Amino acid sequence: MSNFLKIKNLSVNVEDKTIINDLNLDIKKGEVHAIMGPNGSGKSTLSNVLAGKNGYTISKGSIDFCGEDLISLEPNERANKGIFLAFQYPVEIPGVTNINFIKTAFDSNRKFRGLDPIKPGDFLKLIKEKSQILGIPDDRLKRQLNVGFSGGEKKRNEALQLMILNPLLAILDETDSGLDVDAFK
């Protein structure tokens, strides 16, 4: 099996501070990895670097994703190539409904692959099917993205995004952060 994600000699700085120093990691397609370490050891930094978040300087090393130089890609290109980051603290986006956010991301990926946008009825069927699996009520799809959601509702909503977008690589940063009792049901 070929390398799916290969990180070689990666060093990452935030301002003048080295957060990741000379990291090497090989992940083959289909493998599941848990990266563990104390606070400040670079777990979230690695997640953010893989997703292309600004504010990080790669001082050394390379990241190869499915045979392509990941470092040269913009965040939206990384997402369209199949990288998904579930945030430790999902952001609220007032004025944007949950369903519109997910459909926009879904259609953006379809456009990247040369496909037409999904028909609204087909998307509604898909999102309701996945929402039901996760126990997400229909009314939450019409609410503003993560606005007023509990920690568990936000995490469940990210799980819905993950199921709909079906990425090649899912990076789950602090998956238990902000969970409520209902999330454990």
Regions found by a protein language model. Name each.
Residues 36-41:
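The feature captures the beta-strand-to-loop junction immediately N-terminal to the Walker
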Residues 5-7, 20-22:
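Conserved structural motif at the start of ABC-family nucleotide-binding domains
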Residues 33-35, 47:
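Short hydrophobic beta-strand immediately N-terminal to the Walker A/P-loop
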